[in-house]
Every structure is written in C-alpha cells, then in structure tokens.
Amino acid sequence: MNSSYKSRVFNIISIIMVSMLILSLGAFANNNKAKADSHSKQLEINVKSDKVPQKVKDLAQQQFAGYAKALDKQSNAKTGKYELGEAFKIYKFNGEEDNSYYYPVIKDGKIVYTLTLSPKNKDDLNKSKEDMNYSVKISNFIAKDLDQIKDKNSNITVLTDEKGFYFEEDGKVRLVKATPLPGNVKEKESAKTVSAKLKQELKNTVTPTKVEENEAIQEDQVQYENTLKNFKIREQQFDNSWCAGFSMAALLNATKNTDTYNAHDIMRTLYPEVSEQDLPNCSTFPNQMIEYGKSQGRDIHYQEGVPSYEQVDQLTKDNVGIMILAQSVSQNPNDPHLGHALAVVGNAKINDQEKLIYWNPWDTELSIQDADSSLLHLSFNRDYNWYGSMIGY
C-alpha cells in the first residue's frame, strides 16, 4: 500500500470523524435548546417568600410518595414515578396568608395531587412556623387546574375568599374552585383585584413542576389499607348546607351496599314542610342525625373527640360508618359553614405511621391525613376542629 493511498484513506476517515462530531454537537445543542425551551414554558407561582421551614421540607419529602401511592390505590389508579414540586402559598385578596404549605405531587409528568402541610392540632395554631407541629394531608385539591397550565409561560397568584379559590394572571382573576354556599355561582371571571400591598410583597416565585433534590430519606411503603368495602362518591355538595345529608347518604349507601340514599331526599325527610326554594338553607342538628339513622335501622350514638386509630380500624372492618363533626376554628358566628360534617372511609398505615381516610362532601376525591391530628385543613382554606363523631351508620 503506497503512501498516497494511505493519505487518501486517512483524509476520508478524518472527514467522517469531523462530520460525526459536528452532527453530535448539533444534536447536543438542539437537545439543550429543547430543554431550555421546555424550561421557559413552565408556570411560575408568585409568593412572598420561597423559604420553607426545614421540618416542613423534610416531612413532605419523606411522606409524599407513600401518600400518593395510597390515594392511587383508593381510586384504582396505577402507581407511577412520584415527584414533589416546589411549595406554594395561598393568599387572601388583602394579602393575608394561611399557615399551610402546598406541594404539587407529580406522577409521570402530570400534577395529580396536592400535599398540604398544616398545623397538627389547635395548640399549634399559636406557634411560629418553625416551632409548630405539622399534619400531612393529600388530596386532589386544585391539582388538575395547575396541571392544565403547568407548561404555560406565565405567572399566577393563588388567591382565596369566602367564595372559593382563584388564579390571578395578568390582572385577570379566574375562579377555579367554588365554595359550597347557598346561592353561590361558579363564575368564571371575578371583578376582584389583588391589593396593592400584596402585589408589592410578592417578590419571589416558585415552579410547581420543578423537582428539587430529595435530601430526606423518601419512604413509599403502604403497609395497610382498610376502607368501607362499598364506599363510592356519588354526589358533591355545592349550593346548599347539606354536609351531614351528603355524609349520611354516602355512609348508608356503603354499609347497606345500595345506591338509594342521596342528600336531597334525606333533607326532604328531615324538613317535610320546607319549600324547595328554602331547603338549601337548611342544615342538620345532632339529634336529627341520630333520629334519621335510627329510622334507617341504625343505632347511632355520639362520641366526643377523635376516635382512635384502632377504633376506626375495627368499626371499618365491622362495616360501621363514622361521621365526623367539625367546627371552624375561626368561630365566626356569621359563617354559613361554622359547622361541617364529613364521612370517615377508613384507615391506613403508611411508612409505619397511622392515617385516616375521609371524604369531604365538597370534594370529588378522598383525602388522607395523620390519624393523630384533630385539625382538618379543608378545601376552602380554613381549619376545622374535629370535636366529635356520630358512630353507627
């Protein structure tokens, strides 16, 4: 083989290698550009501060995957790869914020749940953010609404008032979750505006789809779940005060394995003389809850406080329904939801910790939270104290 032939072969190989290098660099650049474009199209949520207490971070990172897996099992959904987005806050229009932190839970690229960390018991309400004990809860609260706009290159502020929850974007306020109130309307647009004070204070942003390094040891073991065998969500409370009616109907349908009960019929039975127009304003008193249960062949009794995990476990195994009686911590006498009723669906053990599963009639999905927490942080941004239970449905 002469030297000129060797030279030609060397040149050809050199050209091929340079071409491959150019192609790979181009692909790398395109990949980086695609990643940059994808990152630039991510939603940002406005917050006053992006600082989160370390104990909140650790608790969220340790628990979110197990909670998500347990809630997926309740809806017969396939489990997947769970990730935790950045925590955001919710504000009133005047700038007040609540004492909870909200984490988007991401599964296979979609925001599917919201992990809420809020004060564990009434005593914690008066403690600083760093000193209070936190309860962990998971639900689908505004998760779908966030998922729909997660890839939008925009900034929103999450707001709340007595009518529900809103997203504010470019000065426009949109209702995303309405409060169940007699006469309430699910208006899409609101004339409300963010206060100038709050606008000035919103100096930071968080990204709901940004996954941070998990510094805490993540645990996702669901060792045990026990629920009322035939429990189904068939209806949802909105423009009325029938929380106990919805809860009793759901529990009786479950324990009797039927679908004949509904909130309207129960309230009509309790208030036979009231017009249809006025019926949405009627609420239910403890003696009515007991008497209605007895009329359906159930021996109902009132028990003060939160039932123990062991009691819930046994009653659920025995196909006995428990209704939660809760009272708003704010104690506002003009509050149409000063009292609230919910249905206990069962219990679970996640990462060796005891949890309760319940249904809030305002929601279309179940919620899971710590069994030793007497505070319920419910759908429209208020804390309720679980003060008693009606047992026997």
Curated annotation (Swiss-Prot):
- For this chain's UniProt record, which GO biological process terms are given? proteolysis
PTM characteristics: Proteolytically cleaved by staphylococcal serine protease (SspA).
Q: Name one GO molecular function term.
A: cysteine-type peptidase activity
**Intracellular or extracellular location(s):** Secreted
* Broad class of the protein's primary localization: secreted
Keywords annotated in UniProt: Hydrolase, Protease, Secreted, Signal, Thiol protease, Virulence, Zymogen
GO CC, alphabetical: extracellular region
Q: Please summarize the record's notes on activators and inhibitors of this protein.
A: Prematurely activated/folded staphopain B is inhibited by staphostatin B (SspC), which is probably required to protect staphylococcal cytoplasmic proteins from degradation by SspB.
The site feature described as Cleavage is recorded at 219-220
Renumbered to this chain, the signal peptide range is 1-36
Specify the enzyme's EC class, one word.
Answer: hydrolase
Enzyme Commission designation: 3.4.22.-
Q: Supply the residue numbers of the propeptide(s) excised during maturation.
A: 37-219
Question: What exactly does this protein do?
Answer: Cysteine protease that plays an important role in the inhibition of host innate immune response. Degrades host elastin, fibrogen, fibronectin and kininogen. Blocks phagocytosis of opsonised S.aureus by neutrophils and monocytes by inducing their death in a proteolytic activity-dependent manner. Decreases surface expression of the 'don't eat me' signal CD31 on neutrophils. Cleaves host galectin-3/LGALS3, thereby inhibiting the neutrophil-activating ability of the lectin.
Family recorded in the similarity comment: Belongs to the peptidase C47 family.
Supply any other comment: The cascade of activation of extracellular proteases proceeds from the metalloprotease aureolysin (aur), through SspA to SspB.
Q: How does it assemble?
A: In the cytoplasm, prematurely activated/folded SspB forms a stable non-covalent complex with SspC.
Q: What is this protein called?
A: Staphopain B
